[in-house]
């Protein structure tokens, strides 16, 4: 889809961005249902795990992270991401959404342990990572929207600390989310993200 913007003619691939939003909404709904709907006994039966015995506050954290990520990623996809989304990136991001939204819930929502200092660390890491990722993108977006900066590389703001500070933020918030699950298998996700 072509659209005239202040910066000229831009291909937005709005269809894929809206499809991201819809799929991400479905993932969030599935995660919520696994955490809080007693009617979803098929998940318990498949994994032979009783999700109803999971710590309620851990479930709230897992779902809250999902909602926060949903809002952040839609801000990024619909507002900050100006370029066309290639189809392979669409499928890669969709797979990542499934791992975060549904995978972390499947791994952590059944854990009965009370929240502890490790969870506080996970929450802080999630918040700090979200800040580095999103705020750095907002700063770069402001820079790119200035016609005087056309063709220039952005090395100010948070990007003055690292070339890919936004990706550092990704690794932090995903690691924080994995920590909240209290499941070592969740550690595979941030490891895969760094490769």
Residue ranges of predicted features:
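Membrane-water interface of transmembrane alpha-helices
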Residues: 68-79, 132-144
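Alpha-helical transmembrane segments in multi-pass membrane proteins
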Residues: 1-100
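Hydrophobic transmembrane alpha-helical segments that form the core helix bundle
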Residues: 76-128, 134
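Hydrophobic transmembrane alpha-helices
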Residues: 5-49, 108-139, 148-195
């Amino acid at each position: 889809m072509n659209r005239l913007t202040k910066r000229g003619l831009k291909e937005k691939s709005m269809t894929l961005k809206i499809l991201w939003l819809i799929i991400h909404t479905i993932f969030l709904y599935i995660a919520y249902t696994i955490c809080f709907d007693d009617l979803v006994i098929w998940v318990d039966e498949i994994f032979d795990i009783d999700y109803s015995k999971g710590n309620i506050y851990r479930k709230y954290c897992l779902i809250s992270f999902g909602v926060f990520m949903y809002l952040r990623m839609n801000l990024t996809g619909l507002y900050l991401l100006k370029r066309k989304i290639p189809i392979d990136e669409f499928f890669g991001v969709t797979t990542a959404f499934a791992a975060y939204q549904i995978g972390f819930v499947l791994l952590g929502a059944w854990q009965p342990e009370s929240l502890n200092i490790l969870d506080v660390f996970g929450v802080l890491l999630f918040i700090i990572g979200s800040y580095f990722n999103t705020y750095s993108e907002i700063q770069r977006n402001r820079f790119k929207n200035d016609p005087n900066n056309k063709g220039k590389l952005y090395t100010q703001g948070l990007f003055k600390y690292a070339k890919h500070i936004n990706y550092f933020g990704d690794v932090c918030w995903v690691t924080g989310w994995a920590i909240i699950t209290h499941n070592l298998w969740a550690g595979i996700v941030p490891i895969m993200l760094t490769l």
